[in-house]
Curated annotation (Swiss-Prot), chain B:
Family note: Belongs to the cytochrome c oxidase subunit 2 family.
Known function: Component of the cytochrome c oxidase, the last enzyme in the mitochondrial electron transport chain which drives oxidative phosphorylation. The respiratory chain contains 3 multisubunit complexes succinate dehydrogenase (complex II, CII), ubiquinol-cytochrome c oxidoreductase (cytochrome b-c1 complex, complex III, CIII) and cytochrome c oxidase (complex IV, CIV), that cooperate to transfer electrons derived from NADH and succinate to molecular oxygen, creating an electrochemical gradient over the inner membrane that drives transmembrane transport and the ATP synthase.
Segments on the Mitochondrial matrix face: 46-59
The species this protein was found in: Carassius auratus (Goldfish)
The protein's name: Cytochrome c oxidase subunit 2
Entry's Gene Ontology cellular component terms: mitochondrial inner membrane; respiratory chain complex IV
Length: 111, 230
């Protein structure tokens, strides 16, 4: 069975989240795991309460994953907008070069 | 196009579908986190030895589990509404095509410049050439120029149908006596498949939609050829 565009069959966490093919997912989960470990460990070292440390670890996982996810997706969205603007700019430059609609020509014309 | 055992969306072929994919990733991540939390709480509840039969109220947790879901819903609603309004934008289409649903085929009319119209019937399984897709191929494809906004006016001649192409992020009901409008931009050349998405009788599953996005000069050549053949 061939996959679309040569994509690998991604690893699905909990059967739903495709980490490999979803942008920012892998980084967010890894940051979440790290944050969970740190939060749980620090709490345990401070209080020696095992169960509560696990709770803090899970809360840390959720908050770190969410924070990392939003930050990465926001930057990703900005990059996509820039990419689209650059693509349109290249296309317009190719189409309008040498005509009176050429944006570079307008700037030199104003001087 | 779809492949066997596929669970997720097809690759996006239009900017709107790209945005929908991104929103889906966003919503799925939130769903994943909620599921993780619920699973953890279930395991904690099942494995605890603590029991307290005298809890009457608990203001703090009630406040948390009221405000937190509200915040989560706002985080989902804002991008959702953004895409909803994005999908309703019709930005000066370069081409208008009428897609009419019949029992059981689609017909397309390109009437901007000349009167070009043709029917699009499914290719029966026994007539498929090697490499063609069963129940998806048609004898005539709807050809559109790539990277150009295209408006589709969808209606039906008999019963309800629905014109849908998943990779373009388009689905619009074809209602007899009503003209529905949708639009898309095919960001890359290719062949995009869809199927009728409203039950319309015995052969509802056998009236597919095929959209072929080509560079503008190829589109012009194709339309000239089609007019000559008509």
């Amino acid at each position: 069975m061939t996959d679309e565009g040569g994509k690998n069959q991604g690893m699905k966490v909990m059967g739903i989240l495709d980490i490999q093919n979803t942008p920012c997912a892998r980084e967010s989960i890894l940051h979440g795991a790290g944050g969970s470990l740190v939060a749980g460990l620090v709490h345990f070292l401070a209080t020696s309460r095992v169960k509560r440390s696990f709770d803090v670890g899970v809360a840390g996982f959720m908050l770190t994953t969410l924070g990392s996810w939003f930050y990465c997706r926001f930057n990703n969205a900005k990059l996509r907008v820039q990419q689209r603007m650059i693509q349109d700019g290249i296309k317009n430059k190719v189409i309008y070069e040498g005509t009176n609609l050429d944006p570079t020509q307008k700037k030199t014309g104003d001087q | 196009m779809a492949h066997p055992t596929q669970l997720g969306f097809q690759d996006a072929a239009s900017p709107v579908m790209e945005e929908l994919l991104h929103f889906h990733d966003h919503a799925l991540m939130i769903v994943f986190l909620i599921s993780t939390l619920v699973l953890y709480i279930i395991i904690a509840m099942v494995s605890t030895k603590l029991t307290n039969k005298y809890i009457l109220d608990s203001q703090e947790i009630e406040i948390v589990w009221t405000i937190l879901p509200a915040v989560i819903l706002v985080l989902i609603a804002l991008p959702s509404l953004r895409i909803l309004y994005l999908m309703d934008e019709i930005n000066d289409p370069h081409l208008t095509i009428k897609a009419m649903g019949h029992q059981w085929y689609w017909s397309y009319e390109y009437t901007d410049y000349e009167n070009l119209g043709f029917d699009s019937y499914m290719v029966p399984t026994q007539d498929l050439a090697p490499g063609q897709f069963r129940l998806l191929e048609t004898d005539h494809r709807m050809v559109v120029p790539m990277e150009s906004p295209v408006r589709i006016l969808v209606s039906a001649e008999d019963v309800l149908h629905s014109w849908a192409v998943p990779s373009l992020g388009v689905k619009m009901d074809a209602v007899p006596g009503r003209l529905n409008q949708t639009a898309f931009i095919a960001s890359r050349p290719g062949v995009f498949y869809g199927q009728c998405s409203e039950i319309c009788g015995a052969n509802h599953s056998f009236m597919p939609i095929v959209v072929e996005a080509v560079p503008l000069e190829h589109f012009e050549n194709w339309s000239s050829l089609m007019l000559e053949d008509a």
